[in-house]
Regions:
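Metal-dependent phosphohydrolase cores
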Residues: 1-160
Length: 160
């Protein structure tokens, strides 16, 4: 997990996370912070283990730590956060020693994490999508009534 820890130490990652926090400080809805990134990583890894999918742990954690990293560029430059995040992830992962094929798999997962979410899919992109959605605890959110997520998409029960 040394390369994952290198992501967390990377100046571009830290600056991006700090800028997202600054821009979301008054946000009533779900935030895109370190806790969210780790929730997504852990949920994806649990599903990976439970289903025996064999997706590499480092790639799961890398994708989770990087999937929303482009949020600040969406807020400030109107660039879709998945596209901005994939570009930032490529730079960060290259600096942290990830191989080109690994970077491609993670950036593809980032680009697809807002997709249709076909729950029958396997692989990193599907794990990231499902964990990202499952990480949000709408049941306990005071902003839930104003949230634009559909009722079907909201997590109104605890599932295991």
């Amino acid at each position: 997990m040394e390369r994952v820890n290198a992501i967390c130490r990377h100046a571009l990652w830290r600056e991006s996370v700090d800028e997202i926090a600054r821009l979301e400080q008054d946000r009533a809805f779900c935030r895109h912070d370190r806790a969210h990134f780790l929730d997504v990583a852990r949920l994806a890894y649990i599903e990976n283990l439970e289903r025996g999918l064999g997706v590499d742990k480092e790639l799961i954690y890398a994708a989770a730590l990087l999937h929303d990293i482009g949020r600040h560029l969406q807020y400030t430059q109107n660039i879709p956060h998945d596209e901005a995040g994939a570009q930032l992830a490529e730079i960060i992962m290259a600096d942290c020693g990830f191989l080109p094929a690994e970077r491609a798999e993670v950036t593809q997962a980032i680009l697809q994490h807002r997709g249709d979410g076909d729950r029958s899919r396997d692989g990193l992109a599907a794990l990231l999508y499902r964990a990202d959605k499952a990480s949000r605890m709408c049941l306990f959110c005071t902003a839930e009534p104003e949230c634009n997520w559909s009722r079907e998409k909201k997590n109104m029960t605890i599932r295991a």
